[in-house]
From Swiss-Prot:
Protein name per its UniProtKB record: Translation initiation factor IF-1
Domain of life: Bacteria
Organism: Roseiflexus castenholzii (strain DSM 13941 / HLO8)
Subcellular location: Cytoplasm
Residues annotated as domain S1-like: 1-73
Keyword RNA-binding appears in the UniProt entry: yes
Encoding gene (name): infA
SUBUNIT field: Component of the 30S ribosomal translation pre-initiation complex which assembles on the 30S ribosome in the order IF-2 and IF-3, IF-1 and N-formylmethionyl-tRNA(fMet); mRNA recruitment can occur at any time during PIC assembly.
Length: 73
């Protein structure tokens, strides 16, 4: 989905919705990260609920925070 080369993309599940469009996501490898919704998803009013499977982009500099770029159907 991303055109950036220096991001890590992983799949995960939403475990807890937080205020200000932030979410706690449990990744496939067992780690939990704090993630926010990407601007394009926000523009298109894509709803994310607890239990949804999502694609998360992680920066190699801070692996505890990420950006949700896709919600699987």
């Amino acid at each position: 989905m991303s055109k950036k080369k220096d991001v890590i993309e992983m799949e995960g599940t939403i475990t807890e919705p937080l205020p200000n469009a932030m979410f706690r996501v449990k990744l496939e490898n067992g780690h939990e990260v704090l993630a926010h919704i990407s601007g394009r998803m926000r523009m298109n009013y894509i709803r994310i609920l607890k239990g949804d499977r999502v694609l998360v982009e992680l920066s190699p500099y801070d692996l505890t925070r990420g950006r949700i770029t896709y919600r699987y159907k």
